[in-house]
């Protein structure tokens, strides 16, 4: 795969209560990814950027919320979330990640 594409696939980690519970319980990390990203691209990007072995990837599309603005109703953008399960004994520490 194109190296430039792999660097653009991951937009950042998702920091929430649910992602913290999943990280502790199932050795998983949650990322916000580009809407056009595929599972093999996400797996390759995580393995390349963080030097870990990925067991599997699950993705879901998050629908944007409808919010009120001073101009009426507005819509937040839809986005894609990826749950990445790492091999046993592997972990990603975002504080020291390159």
From Swiss-Prot:
Transmembrane segments: none
InterPro entries on file: Nucleotide-bd_a/b_plait_sf, Ribosomal_uL23-like, Ribosomal_uL23/eL15/eS24_sf
GO cellular component, one term: ribonucleoprotein complex
Record's signal peptide: none
Keywords for the protein's UniProt record, in alphabetical order: Ribonucleoprotein, Ribosomal protein, RNA-binding, rRNA-binding
Superkingdom of this protein's organism: Bacteria
A molecular function GO annotation: structural constituent of ribosome
Annotated GO biological process: translation
Cystine pairs: none
This protein's record includes keyword rRNA-binding: yes
UniProt subunit comment: Part of the 50S ribosomal subunit. Contacts protein L29, and trigger factor when it is bound to the ribosome.
Family of the protein in this entry: Belongs to the universal ribosomal protein uL23 family.
NCBIfam families from the UniProt entry: PRK05738.1-3, PRK05738.2-4
Function: One of the early assembly proteins it binds 23S rRNA. One of the proteins that surrounds the polypeptide exit tunnel on the outside of the ribosome. Forms the main docking site for trigger factor binding to the ribosome.
Protein known as: Large ribosomal subunit protein uL23
Organism: Saccharophagus degradans (strain 2-40 / ATCC 43961 / DSM 17024)
